[in-house]
Curated annotation (Swiss-Prot):
Binds 2 Mg(2+) ions per subunit, one in each domain. Mg(2+) is required for hexamerization and phosphatase activity. The modification Phosphoserine is found at S432. This is Circadian clock oscillator protein KaiC 1. ATP 1 binds at G50, T51, G52, K53, T54, L55, S90, K225, L226, R227, T229, H231, T241. Gene3D superfamilies: P-loop containing nucleotide triphosphate hydrolases (3.40.50.300). Disruption phenotype: A triple kaiA-kaiB1-kaiC1 deletion grows normally under photoautotrophic conditions in continuous light. In a light/dark regime has strongly restricted viability and impaired growth behavior, and overall decreased pigments (after 5-6 days); phenotype is more extreme when grown on 0.2% glucose. It catalyses: L-seryl-[protein] + ATP = O-phospho-L-seryl-[protein] + ADP + H(+); L-threonyl-[protein] + ATP = O-phospho-L-threonyl-[protein] + ADP + H(+); ATP + H2O = ADP + phosphate + H(+). GO terms for biological process: circadian rhythm; protein autophosphorylation; regulation of circadian rhythm; regulation of DNA-templated transcription. PANTHER family: CIRCADIAN CLOCK OSCILLATOR PROTEIN KAIC 1 (PTHR42926:SF1), PTHR42926. The modification Phosphothreonine is found at T433. Homohexamer; hexamerization is dependent on ATP-binding. Core component of the KaiABC complex, at least composed of a KaiC homohexamer, a KaiB dimer and two KaiA dimers. Interacts directly with SasA. Multimerizes, probably forming homohexamers, no interaction with KaiC2 or KaiC3 is seen. Interacts with KaiA. In another study interacts with itself, KaiB1, KaiB3 and KaiC3. Interacts with SasA (hik8). Component of the oscillator and circadian clock in this organism, enhances fitness in a rhythmic environment. Autophosphorylates in the presence of KaiA, no activity is seen in its absence. Phosphorylated on serine and threonine residues by autocatalysis. Has a 4 step phosphorylation cycle; the autokinase acts first on Thr-433, then Ser-432. When Ser-432 is modified KaiC switches to an autophosphatase mode, acting first on phospho-Thr-433 then phospho-Ser-432.
Amino acid sequence: MNLPIVNERNRPDVPRKGVQKIRTVIEGFDEITHGGLPIGRTTLVSGTSGTGKTLLAVQFLYQGIHHFDYPGLFITFEESPSDIIENAYSFGWDLQQLIDDGKLFILDASPDPEGQEVVGTFDLSALIERIQYAVRKYKAKLVSIDSVTAVFQQYDAASVVRREIFRLVARLKQLQVTSIMTTERVEEYGPIARFGVEEFVSDNVVVLRNVLEGERRRRTVEILKLRGTTHMKGEYPFTITHDGINIFPLGAMRLTQRSSNARISSGVQTLDEMCGGGFFKDSIILATGATGTGKTLLVSKFLQEGCRQRERAILFAYEESRAQLSRNASSWGIDFEEMEHKGLLKLLCTYPESAGLEDHLQMIKSEISEFKPSRIAIDSLSALARGVTNNAFRQFVIGVTGYAKQEEITGFFTNTTDQFMGAHSITESHISTITDTILMLQYVEIRGEMSRALNVFKMRGSWHDKGIREYSISHDGPDIRDSFRNYERIISGSPTRISVDEKSELSRIVRGVKDKTAE
């Protein structure tokens, strides 16, 4: 049960092994820290109110006790032990049982509610001795301190704060414990800590943020430094679930998933022919177009075909209710309720604004892990993009597509464009590069009548039809016809009819080229 002792590296007769780490078993945290926290060192966790500092400190101890049987010590300067124990219950962590078993000890250093007056020179000697006594008595390997700001907020001299924090960190290192020390900051992107000195006396610094982006809050974590070892750079989104902190280390994702040559049907025979025999299994398809062009219809046919093949499927809907989806599908001869009754289909409908993108991503991953579908659909991505930054939205899409490919799932997503007719950007967030197949749907005005057009704009690794097909929607679903004949500039929104003379001239030129080639 003894951890590797880092201070042995300082002995001349012991070969250097580098900084060794202990896994935190916090979802995603070990990935961005390249293996966990350095053993025998103190990590400063800084953040504004509500970022999850206390939760991280408690979860660090709980996971260490639960997975590795390392005794832990929690030192609280703010909340009472009873509040900490009660709050932990909401995550399924029975701290009282760990205390009764002698695996966890909570040292109550919270302030006297009646107030206290400081007289003379301030130092932490008595507190440091209490911590040392508790560490040795309970043989603690892990220590969490929450938070040092509460101790020093009534003292103005930065030199005193620096001196006492340095003494505390030095004693923890001498005791050979791996510790987390939380501190508050005033701004999300300002000074790292309240007093401006905490980060300089700590070996490692982790910054938690809770930033208002657009109309939603977004939590991120950044590893500012891990002294003597490597870590991932930048901010990574995280959410707080019933299991605690869950980080999405998108930068740690590797493009190592297998690619299948097997084809699956879209549920529309003509569309399969346009795609060279159907979609690739485990590929990501994006149908983009104005409202009413038939995107949800293509999604419904895609899901229906999967259920017909006895495959499981999930539809994540962010614009329509379950009743509305079922009603619309029935008008095309698709019975969603029967598929659900057979256990082949799952409809999940929610408003995009009901949660942050990280929460939606976590929910999608959890549902996929539980239901184990072969096909998933999201209708629509553009609904989720409302009120968030392009970068946050792109990270969300990368998280979904990366997880789907990892699980070898075929994904069909829709995107609603803001222009009703004419040329338009496929997506505003450049997510088109992440998808494997793009179906472009749009309206076309021909001789005063409105028609629909469909084009396989892109399909990685496969031949596909380059033509712009006309299609209509009937009670059987989409009816894809031949390409628009005698018309050009359809995608631009200004279709122009090619005259007979122009056609004859083009034919003559083509025949001339063929004759010269034959000679």
